[in-house]
């Protein structure tokens, strides 16, 4: 059986591990997109360290959880958002203004919606976390 969306599967696994109180989550298969999303989550303080472990197949990410995540998930379909339209999607995916973040794929790489708004770029919504 193949995975239809590895990013959605990985974020759902992180959310489930957080909710049951685990300290570590193992995400497989690993991909560059999952690694970049984990990097943004680490920069914003939602997860601890993470590392890529080669297993001879697709690889595994070992993620240290620190209890900061209430919910995270992938945005499907990946909506195209202009730099002045982020507020509409904040209302849709985040519980309150200024609480949580949207991760956006922009021409300048993956970043949070606040960074994209400050840089004046739009992109496609990848995931949300709070």
From Swiss-Prot:
This protein's GO CC annotations: ribonucleoprotein complex; ribosome
Keywords: Ribonucleoprotein, Ribosomal protein, RNA-binding, rRNA-binding
Gene Ontology MF term list: rRNA binding; structural constituent of ribosome
Cross-referenced Gene3D superfamilies: 3.30.1370.30, 3.30.1490.10
GO biological process, one term: translation
Family: Belongs to the universal ribosomal protein uS8 family.
Role played: One of the primary rRNA binding proteins, it binds directly to 16S rRNA central domain where it helps coordinate assembly of the platform of the 30S subunit.
PANTHER family in alphabetical order: 40S RIBOSOMAL PROTEIN S15A (PTHR11758)
Quaternary structure and interacting proteins, as annotated: Part of the 30S ribosomal subunit.
Name of the protein in its database record: Small ribosomal subunit protein uS8
Lineage of origin: Archaea, Methanobacteriati, Methanobacteriota, Methanomada group, Methanococci
